[in-house]
């Protein structure tokens, strides 16, 4: 057995926080490829709803791979995966990409499944977005399954699972919290002075966000900041995609490197609360501003309050 086979044989499921922002997802994609991807993996299944960051993660894992659902390549026909027999000469495709949800508008599922298995049997690698939609038509599970919701799940299935439908359910149930947290995070940046926004670093927590300020504590009134954010949430102002580096909050431009990972409007942010004190991260010398979203946000706030013996509040 090869080294990669021995290394992966006991791996079932790993979990990461799904970062918000293009560069952080790229970095995580590189890390996942280095830790979990084997050169012998031929079928890679990626699962998650629109706006979850699947395509960005794939670009991080497979630099240089042409994604067939790109806005710039969406009209390129025929789909390379469906046109394998026309590839001649020395240089042929090694890795194919296919977005099943998109391609089902053009091609029957069983034809897509046949093309995927044909490529795999020819020793090619196929990266399949929305793998859960095509799995019932395939004769096999993926070598590596990746689910993107609030968390990123990396699974190496065996005959007993995990199966795509269970990964899909978990991602669908959790994605709304990631979208709410990202919108609340950008809303927080929107309401603080630009000089503080520009020096803030970003971290992730369950059902929430962290803005980390290095070296010194910002001069911010957190009670007032929460009131202003809640006022905008109550107004239910729209969150609009502008370009790959900006969104519009109520028509006002705001920088954002994950512009598609948002709720449609601020009114969709449920249960928002700020921790009313900065947490001091001794190890990295940073002051942490923590926000929580979701139905259990008060429970999370209470849990943080009980942790005062372990964390420094300032």
Give residue spans per PLM region.
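N-terminal pre-Walker A segment at the start of P-loop NTPase domains
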Residues: 2-39
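Walker A (P-loop) ATP-phosphate-binding motif of ABC ATPase nucleotide-binding domains
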Residues: 43
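Hydrophobic anchor at the beta1->P-loop junction of P-loop NTPases
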Residues: 46
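The conserved Walker
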Residues: 50
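A conserved segment at the C-terminal end of the G1
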Residues: 55-68
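Conserved nucleotide-sensing/catalytic segment adjacent to the nucleotide-binding pocket
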Residues: 69-132
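Active-/binding-site microenvironments in catalytic and ligand-binding cores
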Residues: 165-314
